[in-house]
C-alpha cells in the first residue's frame, strides 16, 4: 500500500490489500504443522525446530534466523529464501523485504567515561578481526559497515538475498518502524488468532488493522 500510494508513513492505513493478506493467512493456517485452532500454542522455537529437522517446508524469518536452523537435518545447500507473493501486479519484479528496526545507541546522559567506553567497544566490534568474525561468521549477520569487505558471512540466506539483488529485483521497503504502536500490533494479532480459532471474523481483522491504526496513531501523536 505504501508503494502504491507513494508514501513512507501514514496516519490512516486503508487496508487496500487485506483480501490478499487473507489468502496468505488462510494458506498458512491450512498448511501448518498444527491445527489452526492450536497456533497460539506454538512458539518461535517450535517453528525453528520443525524447519531445521525437516518437519516443515517453510519458516518465515530473516537472515538472522540462520543461527537457529543451521547444523541440523536440512542441508545448507537446500536452504533459500522466497518473497511472500500476494497476487499483486508487478510483484514478480520484487525481491525480499530488507532493512532493520534496531539501532546502536549511546546514552548521552551517561558519564563521559561510560560513553567513551561504549564508543570504543562499538569500534572494536566493527573494526577488529575478532569483532568482525563474531558478527559475520559466528552470528551470520549481514552488516552495512564498510569494514566488512573481507568478512562476508557464510550464510546461505544472506547469499539468497544477494542473488535477488544481483538479478535486479527491487527490495521491499522495511516499514515495521512506522507501525503506530505496539498496542496496534497486539490487537491485530488478537484478531488474527480469533479468526484462526474460528471465534472471530475477517471483518474483525480488518477493523483492528484499519480503524485500530487510525486510533493508535492519533493517541500516539496527541
Segments (PLM) and residue ranges:
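Beta->alpha turn/N-cap motifs
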Residues: 44, 61-66, 84, 100-102
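Short helix-initiation/N-cap motifs at beta->coil->alpha
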Residues: 38-53
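Periplasmic solute-binding protein
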Residues: 1-8, 92-108, 183-193
Amino acid at each position: 500500500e505504501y508503494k502504491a500510494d507513494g508514501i513512507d508513513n501514514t496516519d490512516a492505513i486503508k487496508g487496500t490489500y487485506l483480501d490478499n493478506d487473507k489468502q496468505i493467512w488462510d494458506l498458512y493456517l491450512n498448511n501448518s504443522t498444527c491445527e489452526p485452532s492450536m497456533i497460539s500454542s506454538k512458539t518461535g522455537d517450535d517453528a525453528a525446530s520443525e524447519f531445521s529437522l525437516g518437519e516443515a517446508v517453510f519458516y518465515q524469518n530473516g537472515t538472522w534466523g540462520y543461527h537457529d536452523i543451521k547444523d541440523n537435518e536440512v542441508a545448507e545447500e537446500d536452504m533459500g529464501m522466497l518473497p511472500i507473493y500476494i497476487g499483486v501486479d508487478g510483484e514478480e519484479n520484487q525481491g525480499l523485504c530488507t532493512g532493520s528496526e534496531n539501532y546502536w545507541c549511546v546514552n548521552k546522559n551517561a558519564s563521559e567515561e561510560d560513553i567513551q567506553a561504549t564508543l570504543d567497544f562499538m569500534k572494536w566490534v566493527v573494526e577488529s578481526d575478532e569483532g568482525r568474525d563474531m558478527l559475520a561468521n559466528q552470528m551470520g549477520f549481514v552488516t552495512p559497515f564498510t569494514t566488512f569487505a573481507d568478512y562476508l558471512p557464510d550464510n546461505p540466506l544472506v547469499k539468497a538475498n544477494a542473488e535477488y539483488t544481483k538479478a535486479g529485483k527491487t527490495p521491499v521497503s522495511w516499514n515495521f518502524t512506522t507501525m503506530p504502536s505496539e498496542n496496534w500490533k497486539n490487537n491485530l494479532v488478537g484478531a488474527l488468532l480469533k479468526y484462526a480459532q474460528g471465534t472471530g471474523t475477517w471483518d474483525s481483522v480488518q477493523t483492528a488493522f484499519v480503524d485500530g491504526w487510525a486510533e493508535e496513531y492519533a493517541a500516539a501523536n496527541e
